[in-house]
Amino acid sequence: ENREDSIPSRLILELSLKDTEHPLVLDFKSDHGNPDSGIVNGVSVPIEYQKEHLIIPAGQLKEGKNKIEIEFTAGEMSLNRNEDHLFTLLVPDRARTLFPCFDQPDIKATYALEVIAPDDWEVLCGSPLEKREEKGQFTGHLFRESDKISTYLFSFVAGKFDVEKSYATLRNMKLFHQVKDSTKIQLITGVIFDQHQQSVDYMEQYTSYDFPFQKLDYATLFTHPYGGMDHTGAIQYRQSLLFLDNSATENQKLRRAKLIAHETAHMWFGNLVTMEWFSDVWMKEVFANFMADKLVNPEFPEINHDLSFFVDHYPAAYTVDRSRGANPIRQ
C-alpha cells in the first residue's frame, strides 16, 4: 500500500529438462539485491548471480520435471507505482526486472498468480480470478492458471479501482477504472464494451479462429505511458483516450475505436502468434494497424481516411527517408 515499501515475492518454477549436464540460467535484473539460495526439487542450493543472470547449479537438476522455489524482492523498474494503484509494463524484455524468468518472446509458459493486496484494492491479471482469501488487513487474490504466453505479456494491475461489468457481451468483460464522473461512466462504458465485442467478432470472422484466450478484460490508467498495451486477457489503456469528453470530435472517437481494435487484434497477431525476437515487432504492429483500419474505417464514413492516413504517416516517413541513415524496418 505504501509505494516506498518493498514487495516480498516468491517464485515457484516448474519445468521439464532434457539436459542436466549444465546449470540452469534465469534472467534477473533487480534493484533490490539478488537471492543467494533457492530450493531445487526439495533441496536448498546456492544460487550464483552473474551479469543479470541467476545460475542454478546442475547438481540437483534432473531429467524430466523439476521444481525450483526462489524467494526474492520484486524489482521496481517495471512496477509503475502510484499512491493508490500500480501496474506492470514488461515490454520488451523487462519481465526480468520484476521476477526471475526466461525473458524472451519465443519461450511461452503458463502462470498462476497470487497477489496479496490491501482490502480495498482490486486486482486484474491475464487469467480469471479463482478466489479471494482474507489475510488479516489484506486480501489474497488467487488467479487460475493462465494460457501459454510470452513473458512480456504477463501483467497485473492492482489498486483502488471501480469495476464495471458487461453482461450484454458474449464474454462478460470487465473494465477497471478510476473515473469519478458518473455521467461519463454511464455514457461511455457501454461504448467501450461494444467496441471490444465488435473487434472480437470481426477478428473471429476474418481469421476463422475463435478468441484464443480465457477472457478479455481491461483497465484504464491515467498514468499509462502508452496509448495501450495488449497484455493477454488484461489490456491496459491510457484513461483519457477511452473516456472522452462530451465535446470529443469524430477524429477522437475514430482514434479510440482504432486503439481498441488494434489492441484486440493483437490477441491473434502477437499474442497467439508471436515473433521469435523483438527485431520483428514491426510485423505484429503492422497487422494490428491493418486490422484496425479494416474494421473501424467503414464505421466513420464522413472521414476521409485516405487523407487522414497521408497526414498521419507520410511526413514522418519522408523525414526518415531524407536522413543520412534510414533505419531498417527489421532491427
Label each PLM-derived region with a short phrase.
Residues 1-214:
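Acidic/His-enriched low-complexity segments
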Residues 143, 176-331:
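Hydrophobic alpha-helical and helix-loop surface patches within well-folded domains
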